[in-house]
Curated annotation (Swiss-Prot):
GO terms for cellular component: cytosol. Belongs to the bacterial histone-like protein family. This is Histone-like DNA-binding protein. It comes from the Bacteria. GO terms for molecular function: DNA binding; structural constituent of chromatin. It comes from Rickettsia rickettsii. The keyword DNA-binding applies. SMART domains: BHL (SM00411). PANTHER family: DNA-BINDING PROTEIN HU, INTEGRATION HOST FACTOR SUBUNIT ALPHA.
Length: 95
């Protein structure tokens, strides 16, 4: 299921009774702050999970067309580790 920030804002608006515009600003601000924190360090959302930017080291690879050995450059990737409570919730809902 894909959910947009606008949909989250609409859900907040209907649940809390605030204007849709205010809820959109709140959601945008929250996500912007989460992104800024996640870029700099590990971000843990209690009872949800942890986001961390990890660095992959350069490694050898093979070009499948030419069979030549190439070096794959280092790059950053995002790692998410769900909390034990989130895992338990997911496992309960599948039973």
């Amino acid at each position: 299921m894909t959910i947009t920030k606008a949909k989250i804002a609409a859900m907040l608006s209907s649940k809390l009774g605030f204007s849709n515009h205010l809820c959109e600003e709140i959601v945008h601000t929250v996500f912007s702050n989460i992104l800024e924190i996640a870029k700099a360090q590990k971000l843990t959302l209690k009872n949800f999970g942890s986001f961390e930017v990890k660095q992959k080291n350069p490694r050898p690879g093979i070009n499948f067309h030419t069979k030549a050995l190439v070096i794959i450059e280092s790059k950053k990737h995002l790692r998410f580790v769900p909390s034990s409570k989130l895992k338990a919730l997911i496992n309960e809902s599948t039973r």
